[in-house]
Amino acid sequence: MLFSPPLQRATLIQRYKRFLADVITPDGTTLTLHCPNTGAMTGCATPGDTVWYSTSENTKRKYPHTWELTETQSGAFICVNTLRANQLTKEAIQENRLPALAGYNILNSEVKYGAERSRIDFMLQADFRPDCYIEVKSVTLAEKENGYFPDAITERGQKHLRELMGVAAAGHRAVVVFAVLHSAITRFSPARHIDIKYAQLLSEAQNKGVEVLAYKAELSATKMELNEPVPITL
């Protein structure tokens, strides 16, 4: 994924009201950015960090600038736009960069499924193969080199795991992909210290046939690409 037009650089003043952030540009202008992230963003929004933002051509948007990346004061890159996790995963599947998800010729997005009336991020299909249901989660919480999900209690995430267990029980392929969008992370675990229920459900899901995968993205201010498998400890 290439950023076109190129991202612009600023310095973070503060994030507030979950969806807004104030930054100051190199010429001293103060801007308010849209922050497309509902999580705690722990370690991703420290005042003084470098922010890389995109600008929409939609003149009707109240906040035309979108916070895409954080470049921390220690030099790590973090993609804070959670929408990018799905985009990167879709691109990687279509370009056959994820061998575990190769071999399908149809990819559908936001398909309704499950007893709890959810929407799956992706459903892959191919002749003579079971349908493959994929839920994608963005991983940005880092403690040293360890990456964790979630960064806050997520009842929605718990629901998705229950739905995937139902998919596996019905004979389909069920997969949860953790997209690691933090350059300092080298391994992944569920955040038991934040959401013990989610961690327990993830282990249960794996035991009941749900595949758990984690891939890391190469991140820069010019492009992003999901391709590197990350070790998982449940």
Swiss-Prot record:
Pfam families assigned: SfsA, SfsA_N
Gene Ontology MF term list: DNA binding
Keywords from the UniProt entry: DNA-binding
Keyword Cell membrane attributed: no
DNA bind region: 201-220
Keyword DNA-binding (UniProt): yes
Gene3D superfamilies, A to Z: 2.40.50.580, 3.40.1350.60
InterPro entries xref list: SfsA (IPR005224), SfsA_C (IPR040452), SfsA_N (IPR041465)
Domain of life: Bacteria
Family label: Belongs to the SfsA family.
HAMAP family hit by this protein: SfsA
Role of this protein: Binds to DNA non-specifically. Could be a regulatory factor involved in maltose metabolism.
The protein, known as: Sugar fermentation stimulation protein A
